[in-house]
Amino acid sequence: MAHMDFPFYTPKDAFPVGGAVRDLLLGRRPTDLDYAALDPEKAAEEAKRRLGGSLFPLDPKRGHYRLVVGERTLDFTPLEGRLEEDLLRRDYRVNALLWKGGAVFGLKGVEEDLRRRLLVPVREENLYQDHLRSLRGVRLAATLGFGLPRRTREALGRHARFLQAHPEALPARERVKEELARLLLSPRAAFGLRLLERVGLLGVYLPELALLVGLHQGGVHHLPAWEHTLSAVFHLLWLWPEAPLEARLAALFHDVGKPLTRRFDPEVGRFRFLGHAEVGAEIARASLFWLRFPKEVVERVAGLVRRHMDRLPEERKALRRFFLRRQDLLPDLVYLMAADRLATRGVEREAWEVLGRYEEVLKDPLPQRPLLSGEEVMALLGLQEGPEVGRALKALLEAQAEGRVGTKEEARAFLLYWRGGREAQASGTPDHPH
Protein backbone atom coordinates (compact mmCIF):
# COMPACT_ATOMS: atom_id res chain seq x y z
CA MET A 1 0.00 0.00 0.00
CA ALA A 2 1.03 3.63 0.50
CA HIS A 3 4.41 4.82 1.77
CA MET A 4 4.13 7.58 4.34
CA ASP A 5 5.69 9.04 7.45
CA PHE A 6 3.64 8.56 10.60
CA PRO A 7 3.24 12.07 12.07
CA PHE A 8 2.99 11.03 15.73
CA TYR A 9 5.50 9.73 18.23
CA THR A 10 5.91 5.94 18.08
CA PRO A 11 7.81 3.96 20.75
CA LYS A 12 10.43 1.41 19.76
CA ASP A 13 9.03 -1.99 18.69
CA ALA A 14 5.50 -0.56 18.50
CA PHE A 15 3.52 -0.13 15.28
CA PRO A 16 0.59 2.23 14.63
CA VAL A 17 -2.48 0.21 13.66
CA GLY A 18 -6.17 0.53 12.97
CA GLY A 19 -8.22 3.70 12.91
CA ALA A 20 -5.34 6.18 13.16
CA VAL A 21 -3.70 4.78 10.02
CA ARG A 22 -7.09 4.64 8.28
CA ASP A 23 -7.86 8.26 9.12
CA LEU A 24 -4.50 9.45 7.80
CA LEU A 25 -5.13 7.64 4.52
CA LEU A 26 -8.54 9.35 4.34
CA GLY A 27 -7.01 12.76 4.98
CA ARG A 28 -8.48 12.99 8.49
CA ARG A 29 -6.57 13.89 11.66
CA PRO A 30 -6.75 11.01 14.16
CA THR A 31 -7.94 11.76 17.66
CA ASP A 32 -6.86 8.48 19.25
CA LEU A 33 -3.88 6.27 18.46
CA ASP A 34 -3.60 2.48 18.61
CA TYR A 35 -0.32 0.58 18.68
CA ALA A 36 0.50 -3.11 18.35
CA ALA A 37 3.70 -3.79 20.29
CA LEU A 38 6.02 -6.70 20.96
CA ASP A 39 5.92 -5.64 24.64
CA PRO A 40 2.87 -3.38 25.16
CA GLU A 41 3.67 -2.48 28.77
CA LYS A 42 7.24 -1.50 27.93
CA ALA A 43 6.09 0.54 24.90
CA ALA A 44 3.43 2.32 26.98
CA GLU A 45 5.96 3.19 29.69
CA GLU A 46 8.40 4.51 27.07
CA ALA A 47 5.64 6.69 25.61
CA LYS A 48 4.82 8.02 29.07
CA ARG A 49 8.44 9.00 29.70
CA ARG A 50 8.47 10.87 26.38
CA LEU A 51 4.98 12.41 26.39
CA GLY A 52 3.89 12.50 30.03
CA GLY A 53 0.22 11.86 30.76
CA SER A 54 -1.49 9.14 32.81
CA LEU A 55 -0.82 5.45 32.19
CA PHE A 56 -3.08 2.68 33.42
CA PRO A 57 -3.77 -0.97 32.51
CA LEU A 58 -6.97 -1.75 30.64
CA ASP A 59 -6.50 -5.52 30.77
CA PRO A 60 -3.02 -6.45 32.03
CA LYS A 61 -3.65 -10.20 31.57
CA ARG A 62 -4.16 -9.61 27.85
CA GLY A 63 -1.47 -6.93 27.68
CA HIS A 64 -3.75 -3.94 27.04
CA TYR A 65 -2.54 -0.53 28.32
CA ARG A 66 -3.77 3.03 27.86
CA LEU A 67 -1.90 6.33 28.03
CA VAL A 68 -3.95 9.53 28.20
CA VAL A 69 -2.08 12.67 27.16
CA GLY A 70 -4.33 15.72 27.24
CA GLU A 71 -7.28 14.94 24.97
CA ARG A 72 -5.44 12.18 23.09
CA THR A 73 -5.60 8.50 24.02
CA LEU A 74 -2.87 6.00 23.11
CA ASP A 75 -3.79 2.31 23.41
CA PHE A 76 -1.18 -0.46 23.36
CA THR A 77 -1.99 -4.12 22.64
CA PRO A 78 0.18 -7.16 21.83
CA LEU A 79 1.28 -7.84 18.26
CA GLU A 80 -0.17 -11.32 17.96
CA GLY A 81 1.79 -13.65 15.71
CA ARG A 82 2.97 -12.59 12.30
CA LEU A 83 1.85 -9.32 10.73
CA GLU A 84 -0.89 -10.83 8.56
CA GLU A 85 -2.17 -12.96 11.45
CA ASP A 86 -2.57 -9.83 13.56
CA LEU A 87 -4.47 -8.02 10.82
CA LEU A 88 -6.75 -11.02 10.26
CA ARG A 89 -7.96 -10.76 13.88
CA ARG A 90 -9.29 -7.22 13.45
CA ASP A 91 -12.90 -6.14 12.87
CA TYR A 92 -13.15 -4.37 9.48
CA ARG A 93 -10.73 -4.29 6.59
CA VAL A 94 -10.36 -0.51 6.78
CA ASN A 95 -9.18 -0.98 10.38
CA ALA A 96 -6.84 -3.87 9.54
CA LEU A 97 -3.96 -1.52 8.72
CA LEU A 98 -0.45 -1.30 10.16
CA TRP A 99 2.31 1.27 9.64
CA LYS A 100 5.86 -0.07 9.69
CA GLY A 101 9.07 1.42 8.40
CA GLY A 102 7.39 4.12 6.35
CA ALA A 103 4.95 1.74 4.65
CA VAL A 104 1.31 0.87 5.28
CA PHE A 105 0.33 -2.79 5.26
CA GLY A 106 -3.24 -4.00 4.85
CA LEU A 107 -5.35 -6.93 3.72
CA LYS A 108 -6.40 -7.63 0.17
CA GLY A 109 -9.36 -5.45 -0.80
CA VAL A 110 -8.73 -2.64 1.68
CA GLU A 111 -7.60 -0.17 -0.99
CA GLU A 112 -10.89 -0.64 -2.85
CA ASP A 113 -12.82 -0.31 0.44
CA LEU A 114 -11.13 3.02 1.12
CA ARG A 115 -11.63 4.23 -2.44
CA ARG A 116 -15.31 3.27 -2.53
CA ARG A 117 -15.83 4.16 1.15
CA LEU A 118 -17.24 0.79 2.13
CA LEU A 119 -17.14 -1.09 5.43
CA VAL A 120 -16.47 -4.83 5.11
CA PRO A 121 -15.68 -7.22 8.00
CA VAL A 122 -12.30 -8.96 7.87
CA ARG A 123 -14.16 -12.19 8.60
CA GLU A 124 -17.72 -12.56 9.86
CA GLU A 125 -16.59 -14.71 12.78
CA ASN A 126 -14.50 -11.79 14.02
CA LEU A 127 -17.72 -10.02 15.02
CA TYR A 128 -18.22 -12.72 17.63
CA GLN A 129 -14.78 -12.19 19.18
CA ASP A 130 -15.96 -8.83 20.55
CA HIS A 131 -19.72 -8.38 20.42
CA LEU A 132 -19.42 -4.59 20.29
CA ARG A 133 -18.05 -4.81 16.75
CA SER A 134 -21.41 -4.80 14.97
CA LEU A 135 -22.47 -1.62 16.78
CA ARG A 136 -19.04 -0.12 16.08
CA GLY A 137 -19.56 -0.88 12.39
CA VAL A 138 -22.76 1.17 12.31
CA ARG A 139 -21.04 3.98 14.21
CA LEU A 140 -18.09 3.96 11.80
CA ALA A 141 -20.44 4.10 8.81
CA ALA A 142 -22.08 7.19 10.31
CA THR A 143 -18.93 9.00 11.41
CA LEU A 144 -16.90 8.21 8.27
CA GLY A 145 -19.74 8.43 5.77
CA PHE A 146 -19.12 4.84 4.63
CA GLY A 147 -21.68 2.55 3.05
CA LEU A 148 -22.55 -0.96 4.17
CA PRO A 149 -22.63 -3.38 1.21
CA ARG A 150 -25.12 -6.24 1.30
CA ARG A 151 -22.65 -8.77 2.69
CA THR A 152 -21.89 -6.43 5.60
CA ARG A 153 -25.56 -5.70 6.31
CA GLU A 154 -26.34 -9.41 6.27
CA ALA A 155 -23.43 -10.21 8.59
CA LEU A 156 -24.47 -7.48 11.02
CA GLY A 157 -28.06 -8.70 10.86
CA ARG A 158 -27.03 -12.25 11.77
CA HIS A 159 -24.96 -10.92 14.64
CA ALA A 160 -27.91 -8.79 15.84
CA ARG A 161 -30.14 -11.88 15.89
CA PHE A 162 -27.46 -13.74 17.83
CA LEU A 163 -27.38 -10.98 20.45
CA GLN A 164 -31.18 -10.98 20.68
CA ALA A 165 -31.09 -14.71 21.38
CA HIS A 166 -28.09 -14.50 23.74
CA PRO A 167 -28.44 -11.39 25.93
CA GLU A 168 -25.66 -12.72 28.15
CA ALA A 169 -23.26 -11.96 25.27
CA LEU A 170 -24.08 -8.24 25.22
CA PRO A 171 -21.05 -5.95 25.68
CA ALA A 172 -20.58 -3.89 28.83
CA ARG A 173 -23.11 -1.07 28.98
CA GLU A 174 -20.40 1.56 29.35
CA ARG A 175 -18.92 0.49 26.01
CA VAL A 176 -22.35 0.55 24.35
CA LYS A 177 -22.94 4.05 25.72
CA GLU A 178 -19.66 5.31 24.23
CA GLU A 179 -20.48 3.93 20.77
CA LEU A 180 -24.02 5.32 20.81
CA ALA A 181 -22.76 8.72 21.96
CA ARG A 182 -20.17 8.82 19.19
CA LEU A 183 -22.82 7.85 16.64
CA LEU A 184 -25.16 10.61 17.83
CA LEU A 185 -22.38 13.19 17.83
CA SER A 186 -21.75 12.48 14.15
CA PRO A 187 -23.15 14.94 11.57
CA ARG A 188 -24.79 11.85 10.01
CA ALA A 189 -26.54 10.75 13.20
CA ALA A 190 -29.92 10.19 11.52
CA PHE A 191 -28.25 8.02 8.85
CA GLY A 192 -26.50 5.99 11.55
CA LEU A 193 -29.75 5.48 13.48
CA ARG A 194 -31.47 4.29 10.31
CA LEU A 195 -28.67 1.75 9.76
CA LEU A 196 -28.97 0.66 13.39
CA GLU A 197 -32.63 -0.15 12.80
CA ARG A 198 -32.11 -1.73 9.36
CA VAL A 199 -29.54 -4.27 10.57
CA GLY A 200 -31.59 -5.17 13.67
CA LEU A 201 -29.41 -3.57 16.35
CA LEU A 202 -31.97 -0.95 17.42
CA GLY A 203 -33.98 -3.63 19.21
CA VAL A 204 -30.82 -4.99 20.82
CA TYR A 205 -29.56 -1.77 22.37
CA LEU A 206 -32.59 0.57 22.37
CA PRO A 207 -35.67 -1.70 22.52
CA GLU A 208 -37.89 1.14 23.76
CA LEU A 209 -37.25 3.01 20.51
CA ALA A 210 -37.75 -0.10 18.39
CA LEU A 211 -41.44 0.06 19.37
CA LEU A 212 -41.73 3.23 17.27
CA VAL A 213 -40.93 1.34 14.05
CA GLY A 214 -44.12 1.02 12.00
CA LEU A 215 -46.23 2.94 14.55
CA HIS A 216 -48.91 4.84 12.62
CA GLN A 217 -49.68 8.31 13.98
CA GLY A 218 -52.13 10.06 11.66
CA GLY A 219 -53.33 13.62 12.04
CA VAL A 220 -50.61 16.13 11.18
CA HIS A 221 -48.04 13.34 11.19
CA HIS A 222 -47.33 12.20 7.64
CA LEU A 223 -44.59 9.84 8.85
CA PRO A 224 -44.73 6.78 11.11
CA ALA A 225 -43.26 7.42 14.56
CA TRP A 226 -39.75 6.09 13.87
CA GLU A 227 -39.36 7.97 10.58
CA HIS A 228 -40.63 11.11 12.34
CA THR A 229 -37.97 10.60 15.03
CA LEU A 230 -35.22 10.27 12.43
CA SER A 231 -36.51 13.40 10.71
CA ALA A 232 -36.46 15.30 14.02
CA VAL A 233 -32.84 14.26 14.63
CA PHE A 234 -31.93 15.30 11.08
CA HIS A 235 -33.64 18.69 11.40
CA LEU A 236 -32.10 19.34 14.82
CA LEU A 237 -28.62 19.02 13.30
CA TRP A 238 -29.68 21.02 10.25
CA LEU A 239 -30.77 23.87 12.50
CA TRP A 240 -27.99 23.48 15.07
CA PRO A 241 -24.96 21.53 13.74
CA GLU A 242 -23.08 21.98 17.03
CA ALA A 243 -25.98 20.62 19.12
CA PRO A 244 -24.68 18.92 22.29
CA LEU A 245 -25.24 15.26 23.09
CA GLU A 246 -28.17 16.01 25.42
CA ALA A 247 -30.14 17.76 22.67
CA ARG A 248 -29.47 14.89 20.26
CA LEU A 249 -30.56 12.31 22.82
CA ALA A 250 -33.71 14.32 23.50
CA ALA A 251 -34.56 14.39 19.78
CA LEU A 252 -34.03 10.63 19.66
CA PHE A 253 -36.23 9.94 22.70
CA HIS A 254 -38.79 12.75 22.37
CA ASP A 255 -41.64 10.46 21.23
CA VAL A 256 -40.58 7.25 22.99
CA GLY A 257 -43.73 7.46 25.14
CA LYS A 258 -46.11 7.19 22.18
CA PRO A 259 -46.43 3.37 21.99
CA LEU A 260 -47.69 3.27 25.59
CA THR A 261 -50.11 6.20 25.22
CA ARG A 262 -51.63 5.51 21.79
CA ARG A 263 -55.42 5.58 22.05
CA PHE A 264 -58.11 5.95 19.39
CA ASP A 265 -60.34 8.96 20.01
CA PRO A 266 -63.72 8.48 18.27
CA GLU A 267 -64.58 12.16 18.74
CA VAL A 268 -61.77 13.23 16.42
CA GLY A 269 -61.61 9.99 14.44
CA ARG A 270 -57.88 9.36 14.91
CA PHE A 271 -55.27 8.09 17.33
CA ARG A 272 -54.01 10.41 20.05
CA PHE A 273 -51.02 10.19 22.38
CA LEU A 274 -52.11 12.18 25.42
CA GLY A 275 -49.41 12.33 28.09
CA HIS A 276 -46.72 10.85 25.86
CA ALA A 277 -44.20 13.55 26.80
CA GLU A 278 -44.44 12.76 30.52
CA VAL A 279 -44.38 8.99 29.96
CA GLY A 280 -41.52 9.38 27.48
CA ALA A 281 -39.45 11.37 29.98
CA GLU A 282 -39.58 8.48 32.45
CA ILE A 283 -38.76 5.91 29.76
CA ALA A 284 -35.82 8.01 28.56
CA ARG A 285 -34.57 8.38 32.13
CA ALA A 286 -34.69 4.61 32.73
CA SER A 287 -33.09 3.75 29.39
CA LEU A 288 -30.23 6.24 29.73
CA PHE A 289 -29.51 5.29 33.33
CA TRP A 290 -29.37 1.65 32.22
CA LEU A 291 -26.80 2.65 29.60
CA ARG A 292 -24.72 4.35 32.31
CA PHE A 293 -25.07 7.91 31.04
CA PRO A 294 -24.12 10.49 33.70
CA LYS A 295 -26.95 11.68 35.96
CA GLU A 296 -26.74 15.29 34.77
CA VAL A 297 -27.09 14.14 31.14
CA VAL A 298 -30.04 11.88 31.97
CA GLU A 299 -31.94 14.53 33.91
CA ARG A 300 -31.47 17.16 31.22
CA VAL A 301 -32.68 14.78 28.49
CA ALA A 302 -35.69 13.77 30.60
CA GLY A 303 -36.54 17.44 31.16
CA LEU A 304 -36.32 18.18 27.44
CA VAL A 305 -38.53 15.21 26.55
CA ARG A 306 -41.09 16.22 29.19
CA ARG A 307 -41.29 19.81 27.90
CA HIS A 308 -41.08 19.32 24.14
CA MET A 309 -44.87 19.61 23.69
CA ASP A 310 -45.19 22.88 25.62
CA ARG A 311 -46.96 25.65 23.73
CA LEU A 312 -45.57 29.17 23.59
CA PRO A 313 -47.93 31.82 25.01
CA GLU A 314 -48.91 34.75 22.81
CA GLU A 315 -48.53 37.62 25.28
CA ARG A 316 -45.01 39.06 25.66
CA LYS A 317 -44.81 38.98 29.46
CA ALA A 318 -46.12 35.43 29.54
CA LEU A 319 -43.61 34.43 26.86
CA ARG A 320 -40.70 35.80 28.89
CA ARG A 321 -42.05 34.01 31.95
CA PHE A 322 -42.33 30.80 29.88
CA PHE A 323 -38.67 30.91 28.87
CA LEU A 324 -37.52 31.96 32.35
CA ARG A 325 -39.18 28.91 33.91
CA ARG A 326 -37.40 26.68 31.38
CA GLN A 327 -34.12 28.60 31.36
CA ASP A 328 -32.11 25.56 32.50
CA LEU A 329 -33.19 23.72 29.32
CA LEU A 330 -32.30 26.50 26.88
CA PRO A 331 -31.42 26.70 24.07
CA ASP A 332 -31.83 22.94 23.61
CA LEU A 333 -35.59 23.02 24.18
CA VAL A 334 -36.17 25.69 21.54
CA TYR A 335 -34.26 23.77 18.87
CA LEU A 336 -35.95 20.50 19.86
CA MET A 337 -39.41 22.08 19.56
CA ALA A 338 -38.49 23.53 16.17
CA ALA A 339 -37.02 20.25 14.88
CA ASP A 340 -40.13 18.35 16.02
CA ARG A 341 -42.34 20.72 14.04
CA LEU A 342 -40.15 20.58 10.93
CA ALA A 343 -40.58 16.80 11.01
CA THR A 344 -44.38 17.20 11.00
CA ARG A 345 -46.48 18.13 7.98
CA GLY A 346 -48.55 21.31 8.12
CA VAL A 347 -46.97 22.93 11.18
CA GLU A 348 -43.56 23.79 9.74
CA ARG A 349 -44.35 27.50 10.10
CA GLU A 350 -44.54 27.01 13.87
CA ALA A 351 -40.87 25.99 13.88
CA TRP A 352 -39.80 29.37 12.61
CA GLU A 353 -42.17 31.08 15.04
CA VAL A 354 -40.58 29.23 17.97
CA LEU A 355 -37.08 30.25 16.86
CA GLY A 356 -38.13 33.80 16.05
CA ARG A 357 -39.87 34.40 19.35
CA TYR A 358 -36.93 33.00 21.29
CA GLU A 359 -34.61 35.30 19.36
CA GLU A 360 -36.92 38.18 20.22
CA VAL A 361 -36.69 37.36 23.93
CA LEU A 362 -32.89 37.22 23.73
CA LYS A 363 -32.77 40.86 22.60
CA ASP A 364 -33.55 41.70 26.23
CA PRO A 365 -31.71 38.91 28.07
CA LEU A 366 -33.55 37.04 30.80
CA PRO A 367 -32.37 37.77 34.36
CA GLN A 368 -29.96 35.23 35.79
CA ARG A 369 -30.60 35.94 39.50
CA PRO A 370 -33.01 37.92 41.70
CA LEU A 371 -32.12 41.51 42.57
CA LEU A 372 -32.34 40.63 46.28
CA SER A 373 -30.56 37.83 48.12
CA GLY A 374 -32.29 35.26 50.29
CA GLU A 375 -31.04 37.05 53.41
CA GLU A 376 -32.46 40.36 52.17
CA VAL A 377 -35.82 38.73 51.45
CA MET A 378 -35.96 37.17 54.92
CA ALA A 379 -35.16 40.49 56.58
CA LEU A 380 -37.70 42.39 54.46
CA LEU A 381 -40.58 39.94 54.91
CA GLY A 382 -39.69 38.68 58.39
CA LEU A 383 -39.31 35.09 57.17
CA GLN A 384 -37.30 32.18 58.52
CA GLU A 385 -35.33 29.89 56.21
CA GLY A 386 -37.74 27.67 54.31
CA PRO A 387 -39.72 27.16 51.09
CA GLU A 388 -41.52 30.52 51.38
CA VAL A 389 -38.20 32.30 50.79
CA GLY A 390 -37.73 30.29 47.60
CA ARG A 391 -41.24 31.16 46.44
CA ALA A 392 -40.58 34.85 47.05
CA LEU A 393 -37.31 34.74 45.09
CA LYS A 394 -39.03 32.91 42.22
CA ALA A 395 -41.82 35.49 42.10
CA LEU A 396 -39.25 38.31 42.11
CA LEU A 397 -37.24 36.74 39.28
CA GLU A 398 -40.39 36.35 37.17
CA ALA A 399 -41.31 39.98 37.81
CA GLN A 400 -37.83 40.98 36.64
CA ALA A 401 -38.23 38.87 33.48
CA GLU A 402 -41.58 40.50 32.74
CA GLY A 403 -40.03 43.96 33.07
CA ARG A 404 -42.08 44.98 36.11
CA VAL A 405 -39.03 45.21 38.37
CA GLY A 406 -35.68 46.73 37.45
CA THR A 407 -34.11 48.08 40.65
CA LYS A 408 -33.64 46.98 44.24
CA GLU A 409 -36.17 49.56 45.41
CA GLU A 410 -38.75 48.19 42.97
CA ALA A 411 -37.87 44.67 44.10
CA ARG A 412 -38.60 45.53 47.75
CA ALA A 413 -41.87 47.21 46.83
CA PHE A 414 -42.89 44.24 44.68
CA LEU A 415 -42.21 41.71 47.45
CA LEU A 416 -44.21 43.68 50.00
CA TYR A 417 -47.06 43.81 47.50
CA TRP A 418 -46.62 40.09 46.76
CA ARG A 419 -46.74 39.24 50.48
CA GLY A 420 -49.96 41.21 50.85
CA GLY A 421 -51.54 39.11 48.13
CA ARG A 422 -50.40 35.88 49.81
CA GLU A 423 -51.85 36.97 53.15
CA ALA A 424 -55.13 37.98 51.53
CA GLN A 425 -55.47 34.57 49.90
CA ALA A 426 -54.67 32.80 53.17
CA SER A 427 -57.37 34.77 55.02
CA GLY A 428 -60.01 33.98 52.41
CA THR A 429 -60.43 37.54 51.14
CA PRO A 430 -60.87 38.15 47.38
CA ASP A 431 -57.85 37.24 45.28
CA HIS A 432 -55.13 39.84 45.04
CA PRO A 433 -54.51 40.92 41.44
CA HIS A 434 -50.94 39.58 41.62
From Swiss-Prot:
InterPro entries (UniProt xref): HD/PDEase_dom (IPR003607), HD_domain (IPR006674), HDIG_dom (IPR006675), NT_sf (IPR043519), PolA_pol_head_dom (IPR002646), PolyA_RNA-bd (IPR032828), tRNA_CCA-adding_enzyme (IPR050124)
UniProt KW Transmembrane keyword: no
Record field: catalytic activity: a tRNA precursor + 2 CTP = a tRNA with a 3' CC end + 2 diphosphate
BP GO terms, sorted: tRNA processing
Enzyme class: transferase
Organism superkingdom: Bacteria
Molecular function, one GO term: CC tRNA cytidylyltransferase activity
Protein's UniProt keywords contain Metal-binding: yes
UniProt-listed SMART domains: HDc (SM00471)
Binding locations of Mg(2+): 32, 34
Biological function: tRNA nucleotidyltransferase involved in the synthesis of the tRNA CCA terminus. Adds the two cytidine residues to tRNA.
Protein name: CC-adding tRNA nucleotidyltransferase
Species whose genome carries this gene: Thermus thermophilus (strain ATCC BAA-163 / DSM 7039 / HB27)
Native organism taxonomy: Bacteria, Thermotogati, Deinococcota, Deinococci, Thermales
